[in-house]
Amino acid sequence: MDEIRKTGRVTIPTDLDVVPETLEILKKWGADAIRDCDGTDFPQQLKDADAKIYSTYYTTRKDNAWAKANPDEVQQCYIMTGFYTAPGDTVTIPLMKGISPELMQVNTNDDITRWWEVMDRTTGQPVPPEQWSYADGSVTVQAVPFHEYTVSFLAYLIWDPVHMYNATTNGWTNFEHQITFDVRQPKTHKYSMERLRKFIAEHPYVNVIRYTTFFHQFTLIFDELKREKFVDWYGYSASVSPYILNQFEQEVGYKFRPEYIIDQGYYNNQYRVPSKEFRDFQAFQRREVAKLAKEMWTSPTRAGARP
């Protein structure tokens, strides 16, 4: 009786140093596909294996040359300081205390009086920009004694949060931090589409392109010791910039406030009831991501690969 070959619906990961093991498991398990993943590289020896090739494609990172050459289009997010009680008529708040300096860098390039927000948490009201100032990594506030204050500010994600999460969790060493760039901004959008077409042309053996981190960032915040400070795998809150927020304002017809994302320091986690403004923001982000996803989906299908 002829042997019936049973293969399919199993995908196995691989790396440069496990080629023989990959082929062995491919045969034993009857897998029909091989893939790489974050932190691994696809071995060229396997491109002619009797299996489909799935290739991970990073739409927002793994191109530090571009990110370093275009720092104005590095991805950004909002972050809030801790609560600081005013001991007198002023209080000075350090912005990066409790935040990993490897992960974030304060954005002082854009108008801080427009895009930052100092909050009197005792009254729940914003402090007018003329009553606070920034210098040397801290904000000094003209305060009401014994009131609590926070600062919400924009920061560049100088280490991709997912890459940092994977590196920290797996204990990686001797690697370059991948900088995350904003595919929705003009220069990077144009470059990213050219980059994708080039990847497809140079990898004709790839059957399926596995997109990861699809133009938006999860909110992953680490402290100075690389411990998780806040993690939200579901939202779009770490995908902001003045460029994007100006578009949001034009669509919804009202002025954006950092507090819509910060939410008193809760960051609109899944246990919070979202405000109308945050729901508007989520809907806007979702439509923008879907529009760009459609554009990136079209390129590989035209070239014969599957996204």
Which role does the model predict for each range below?
Residues 1-307:
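Glycan-processing catalytic domains of CAZymes
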